[in-house]
């Protein structure tokens, strides 16, 4: 009996030591996969923004007290007359895991809305998108199949019924960073331009008592019309719903309405007969350009995003050269102080509730990693050593007669 107990103790002790070593070095890394029950909500603080009021523009009614300005009287009111300088805007994003999801991949669906706080639903809605991306649960990177979609079509209207957005291959991160993230650059997907660009590590800090990494990215002015048209046309011709999406991204008005002087006109619309030009000047076509500076903070062990800020600016320009000129710091400051081309300027920052909620999710993941990677191996190792000692002691101790 003594020999049997000794043998069992040695075998169990050795097994526990192997388990204690294997758990943090092999089992835990293999177990770092995204969960299948992802649910997260984030919203930004209500913030003073600039906004071109499309309804006021269509009706020809200047916003606020701008109706008293000279350029806002008569038939050819300038675009600046319809831009709010101090409207309050907020954003919300809701992310959930959807099918198809299995042991190797998880599909995330993100719904994002941008809305005014001075109006009630549904009149407050400025934009709404539904984004779907399938991630490799082990690497947290998008799969290489063309299964991502981005629905840019407004949810209202008959053209939206039954609409299916084009599928494409996504290459960058967006809702989740890799578990065990490093202090380096990562490819990041921008949902406005549908492009992937590096987002760079810039700082290490602390939030909620945990270490965080902060990454930053700035995108130069990019034509949203060209970027979104390229995506929407990728599966063939444009539908009526998709043409509606593009309508607001390219506008044509007489030069006077844009506030242009003769020497500022770069591309008068082709086919314009100077003899038939009105006092407002030739028609000038402009596209909406987009630039953004974003900062994202993550808990590096879990890859969970715990804070975010995006300074978004959309404005109209005649071409890329003019867009870059407008975006220069001195011109940018002048434009935002007295907007004439701005479609939207939104310095969005996550609110405290969102930051706290995401940090709770990160801490839950950290707790699991710590338990499996530290606590359990220590207990298993100590118990294994104890059993080995007992087994060897029983073997070496002489049996009494």
Task: Go through each PLM region and give its residues.
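Solvent-exposed N-terminal domain segments of exported/luminal and surface proteins
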Residues: 2-157
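Juxtamembrane interface at the cytosolic side of transmembrane helices
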Residues: 2-11, 365-401
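Membrane-proximal extracellular "stem/stalk" segments
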Residues: 260, 266-271, 277-374, 384
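Membrane-proximal low-complexity regions enriched in glycine and acidic/polar residues
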Residues: 184-315
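N-terminal short leaders/motifs
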Residues: 144-163, 222, 236-244
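Helix N-terminus capping/helix-initiation residues
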Residues: 35, 53, 136, 178, ...
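Short N-terminal edge-element motif at the start of the domain
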Residues: 161-193
């Amino acid at each position: 009996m003594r020999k049997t107990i000794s043998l069992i103790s040695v075998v169990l002790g050795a097994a526990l030591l192997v388990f204690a070593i294997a758990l943090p070095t092999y089992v835990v890394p293999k177990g770092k996969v995204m969960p299948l029950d992802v649910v997260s909500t984030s919203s930004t603080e209500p913030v003073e923004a600039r906004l071109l009021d499309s309804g006021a523009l269509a009706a020809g009614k200047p916003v606020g007290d701008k109706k008293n300005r000279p350029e806002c009287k008569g038939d050819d009111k300038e675009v600046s007359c319809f831009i709010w300088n101090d409207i309050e805007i907020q954003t919300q994003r809701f992310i959930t895991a959807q099918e198809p999801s299995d042991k190797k991949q998880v599909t995330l669906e993100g719904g994002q809305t941008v809305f005014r706080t001075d109006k009630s639903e549904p009149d407050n809605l400025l934009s709404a998108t539904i984004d779907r991306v399938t991630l490799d649960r082990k690497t947290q990177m998008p799969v290489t199949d063309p299964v991502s979609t981005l629905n840019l079509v407004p949810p209202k209207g008959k053209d939206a019924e039954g609409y299916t957005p084009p599928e494409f291959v996504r290459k960058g991160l967006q809702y989740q960073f890799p578990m065990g993230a490093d202090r380096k650059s990562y490819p990041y997907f921008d949902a406005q331009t549908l492009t992937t660009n590096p987002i760079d590590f810039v700082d290490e800090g602390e939030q909620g008592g945990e270490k965080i990494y902060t990454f930053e990215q700035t995108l130069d002015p990019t034509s949203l019309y060209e970027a979104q048209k390229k995506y929407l046309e990728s599966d063939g011709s444009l539908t009526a719903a998709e043409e509606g999406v593009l309508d607001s991204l390219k506008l044509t008005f007489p030069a006077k309405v844009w506030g242009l002087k003769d020497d500022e006109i770069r591309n008068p619309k082709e086919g314009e007969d100077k003899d038939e030009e009105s006092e407002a000047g030739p028609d000038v076509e402009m596209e909406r350009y987009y630039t953004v500076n974003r900062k994202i903070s993550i808990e590096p062990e879990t890859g969970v995003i715990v804070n975010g800020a995006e300074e978004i600016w959309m404005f109209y320009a005649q071409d890329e050269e003019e867009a870059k000129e407008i975006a220069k710091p001195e011109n940018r400051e002048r434009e935002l102080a007295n907007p004439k081309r701005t479609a939207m300027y939104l310095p969005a920052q996550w609110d405290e509730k969102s930051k706290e909620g995401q940090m709770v999710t990160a801490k839950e993941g950290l707790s699991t990693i710590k338990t499996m990677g530290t606590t359990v191996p220590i207990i298993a190792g100590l118990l294994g050593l104890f059993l080995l000692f007992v087994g060897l002691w029983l073997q070496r101790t002489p049996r009494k007669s």
